[in-house]
């Protein structure tokens, strides 16, 4: 028998039959082994047909095992030396199968031919006995085979892949709607109406839904399926079936050339033979362009074009704008066969309606309650803070994650109860240890401990009962809601079937009863809600918390500790940045306005230009602000503008254009802000940058956004922008006023600024703040700050630092220069003071646990051990 004439499944079953014979120590390969191999084939046609005939497959497999077990076995050396030989009956079956394949007008011997041959040849044998026992007849087998195969012919070595192709590679959306498994679709009426109009055309009746990811393209098709089930569609679309095609399943496992095309042709043939009853929905339709394309083979797009043009294939596609442009528009012949339906992102108000429609499904799934305030917050906050995704998807994700968070808290032990149980465990361990001691103190402690343990045990029992009761209440409500949802689904089903008795039973009996029970359960929970251990509601706070986790932007309501921190922000800034009260006040006020929710939503939190001589605290203020807001300086995006002196350096901020090296990496500024949307951005020494760089700043300062080299919008609305400059520092050094900046000096500085920067740039900045030169009082405070840093480093070595007033005076005289600010002071402390201390430590004069005394003698700094 020529193996090339057999399908792959028949060849596989013969190999499996041989292995079964070896496993059971049979010397002969007989029909029963081949029958066993066919029945045990994974996703095989024979077990599929038997299941459709109502045969219990497990029972059938047991009967086969019993029959094979009865066959003669050869054990020991004789079994190893002699191989397994095929019986004459096996060859008879294969010859008969070949004859049957010719009767069926098939090109290959397939598994159904082999099965029919076995039924004929082994009527009185082991296989015949099993078939009779399980009520499997030839006529019954042929009847189901015709249903499965239809008019298909075996023209390839893998024909099973083409039988019931739509069931294998598609999902029936109409059935899912009937089974109440799809989420309700709210709104989108205009898009659904447009899709219905296109589907009702004579030719080119193929809508393609185009929209951004997450705007609800697939939901529109599900909404259409819902309408078809309800009968809320034109006459031409009633009783249509929507099948969602799974391109992944269609391609997966197609090893040989032509196998993919064969499967797709089988799908298209089924759609065609339905005579317009089936609407084929291909999600991510751009995948058909190039799908299955190998050397010389046609891709899926070219295979469906002729049917689309003739109107034989009703197809609904869905894809994004980018993919439509990249794949579909390039293929003009494919593009003209589809009619685009643009799906816009819904507004915040529409999103709220969509979420209200989905609310009940999420409540049932998570077993919790969702407040309406949470729904409104999810729509508003996601729209405001999550810029790179689209409504309603991002808002739905927020609700889902908040529900999951509350659910996981319900399923885990409440914190109060957990603390008590851990304490009981600790005290029991201590009790065990004390019970072995005999002294009076231990006995007294044991009595006190037993009393404390008894109290805790009572408290634990009381709280455990309360916890179990609350949990059972929540579970009961969840089960009742699931039951109510199921009852509503059944009511819809019976309404479609016009079974009015059952509809009345459900609508006026079961459903009101379940609603009453849910209300009762929720009322009893409300009563105990004040001191409840478990929280079972999603509120605005949970949504804010998740937004904060996703973006790093503080959206949550202010807790007491944070209120204090914000109110003390100005004070904290002044502790590090000495003598610049105007600057610290302006920055602190901007942050407070933003955190209270009163800032302009379209602009950054604040944008400032700090002017002043070098070393007066301009950059230090930005660092201190970052440290206070984020507890670290990591959230400061520092860009030294001296690196942007050339015109072409602008591309480094937003990323180079396509075709240039580094295009994929993006820009230094845009990528940093995309990763950390809530940060302080410091543009240091802005006067050093090229004029063209400031053109970028205009849209950042005005609209709080910037478009990078890939066309993506980066959101700057939650950043604080600080620019520093030394422009006008010559005038500022002449300032003699101790309190503020003199008017004529301020005017001179502003005139110089206007000469250097364009008016449209200066006009968009919130505040231009001038820093005064440091006073002698300020220098003393700065010395204390610098010495505190040295002290902290020495503390790590367990060395204490003491500095006399004379030493501080010398540091102020030697280290301070009005032109250079505090930087020379820092250098002086580093070069003189730290060096002297280091020498003493190396020499062993100052060691761990000692006190280093810093004194001033004859205008010099002296370091000694106290």
UniProtKB/Swiss-Prot annotation:
Residues 3-151 form the Clp R domain. Residues 774-866 are annotated as: C-terminal. SMART domains: AAA, ClpB_D2-small. The keyword ATP-binding applies. It is found in: Cytoplasm. Residues 164-345 are annotated as: NBD1. One of its GO terms (cellular component) is cytoplasm. One of its GO terms (molecular function) is ATP hydrolysis activity. Residues 346-552 are annotated as: Linker. ATP 1 binds at residues 211-218. Residues 86-151 are annotated as: Repeat 2. GO terms for biological process: cellular response to heat; protein refolding. It comes from the Bacteria. Keywords: ATP-binding, Chaperone, Coiled coil, Cytoplasm, Nucleotide-binding, Repeat, Stress response. Residues 562-773 are annotated as: NBD2. Residues 396-530 form a coiled coil. The keyword Ribosomal protein does not apply. Transmembrane segments: none annotated. Residues 6-71 are annotated as: Repeat 1. Homohexamer. The oligomerization is ATP-dependent. PANTHER family: ATP-DEPENDENT CLP PROTEASE, HEAT SHOCK PROTEIN 104. The Clp repeat (R) domain probably functions as a substrate-discriminating domain, recruiting aggregated proteins to the ClpB hexamer and/or stabilizing bound proteins. The NBD2 domain is responsible for oligomerization, whereas the NBD1 domain stabilizes the hexamer probably in an ATP-dependent manner. The movement of the coiled-coil domain is essential for ClpB ability to rescue proteins from an aggregated state, probably by pulling apart large aggregated proteins, which are bound between the coiled-coils motifs of adjacent ClpB subunits in the functional hexamer. Belongs to the ClpA/ClpB family. This is Chaperone protein ClpB.
